[in-house]
Amino acid sequence: MRSLLSLGLVLLAVPSWAQAPDEDKPEGKNTPIIVVTGEGLEETPASPAYSSREIAREQIVTTPSGTVEEALGAVAGFQQFRRSDSRSANPSAQGVTLRALGGNATSRALVLLDGVPIADPFFGYIPFGALATERLASIRVTRGGGSGPFGAGALAGTIELESAGLDTLAPFGASLLANDRGATEASAILARPLGAGFAVASARWDRSQGFFTTPEDQRVPATARARYDSWSGSLRGVAPIGTSVELQANALVFDDRRTLRFEGADSSASGADASLRLVGRGEWQFDALAYLQTRDFSNVVISSTRFVPVLDQRDTPSTGLGGKLEVRRPVGGGHTLRLGADFRRAEGELQEDAFSAFTGNVTERRRAGGSTSDLGLFVEDDWSLGELVLTGGLRADRTVIGDGFYVARNPSGGIVEEVIASRRIDWSVTWRAGAAWHATDTLRLRGAAYRGLRLPTLNELLRPFVVFPVVTQANAALRNEELEGYEAAVDFTPAPGVELTATVFDNRVDGAIANVTLAPNLRQRQNLPAIEARGIELGARAAVGAFSVDGTLAYTDAEVVGRGPSAALDGNRPSQTPRWAAAATASWRPSDGWLAALTLRHVGEQFESDLETDRLAPATTLGAFFQAPLVDALSLVVRGENLTGETIVTRNADGSVDLGVPRTFWAGLRYGF
């Protein structure tokens, strides 16, 4: 903790020492104007060739639930492994994906916060409890494989979270809300100029006794509400170095504790992240980044028949580190050339104890651990030819899986099972290419093709787990996943303030990692021959006077290609994967500071497993957000979740069901938003 406080002081000092005023230098009309943004380099000219959608700050901070997950839900096709959000899910199940490329709790989409990958180094899940909506300026979601910086993780797409700066934030902002079950959501954010730069400090605390995820007719005395207690704090400093270079420093700490289904079924996720970034906007533009993450996770599994602990995953420390260097060399002739390299390394270790449900005695002590790394080299060129923009990129990755082991010992120390994984080194080449043509002032045609890559996580390689009574085995021999995809689209703006888009796509993931069912209560992570996903994505935005609407719709036909051990899965839909997904928000802003919005979400039928036996019924929810100014920058806020009381089934294991959030009302005050 002392080191974290020291880092915070350094961050707050950065803007002042990096650009201290020179009192001996007189100001004159030739003094250059220095502007810091806290952002990365601008998007390249061909970025519109790929299927992307931006979520603005106003939409991020006005969701019915107040969570980043719901803001991302505005893009149909975005999904986590389960339908539950970070208030009622096990953190390790919160991997994210796009385009129904699911069936796995690990993230198949790359998630970046200010350019830094934020997935957990061991599990690959996204720590949504550490992400606060009020800290963000925008979110950009790009669907389809990537080949640029950190492209090896962008199998299904890239989600870029951009932190808010002085141009977005008030000098001071705060909010306090409570719901009808006694839950509270409190946050504060301070933004101030320091020298020629600025600093932002923020904190957030969410807590609740939760709701019952277990249906009333399945509850037992040991049944517990989905309690949570989560806090996070961040510090950010931005400062100029000279006239065209800026330094960005970020630190984030968080702790997230949850209880799910039974008393004692407690989980925790915690971490401390730090990064430094140099962005140059001169003739030779560059983006240099280095980051370090320390994370931990714990989880207790309770027997669903005797309601006592059967597994204590007491400690899972992990470390992630990496960096990138991207250079944009001026070449002229309408070209924008990007050259660069990036590196990521993850290492971690699992320590857990298994107990007898009958005696309470330890039956096994288990340890597992290892490391993975990826070194990538990339080049990409955009060529602007009037109304036509062409782009092409190439990426080479050297991936290493090493130091892997799993050992289970009996109480006396004897080895019950031991796996020592061999060190594996691979080189892979991926690419992407696209074109965007402005056929008229209102019509743009675009198309793209790409090949992407994802390295297995340490969790997939080495950690078995139990969701009682189902056991899922690890597999140290897993190969990299590789995606190849194509898409074509049309963007139409028939009138000012009106945007329509339609995209058709065809994606195939070779070697997709899935929990393959071997027996009724036994699964193993295996590389499937493939998952194929074809579909269409529609989007619409319109703003007329005080009214606006934003909507997306996705239909995806995803199926498993199975052979050998997975032959029984051939033609089945991947687990937890819907065909239909839709989202729409209608807003009314009668005057400054007032806002009323309704949000509709729909997710189609899903199946709990790849055998398509346990069905999750379609769910349609309605949410609301209302804000009214009171005095100065103080506003009244009222929110509503699942207003129609829809039954949202998030898990169905042979009739044992978990439910999502019920009808919920929030009310409170906001200042400075």
Functional labels for PLM-detected ranges:
Residues 336-440, 455:
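Signature of Gram-negative outer-membrane beta-barrel scaffolds
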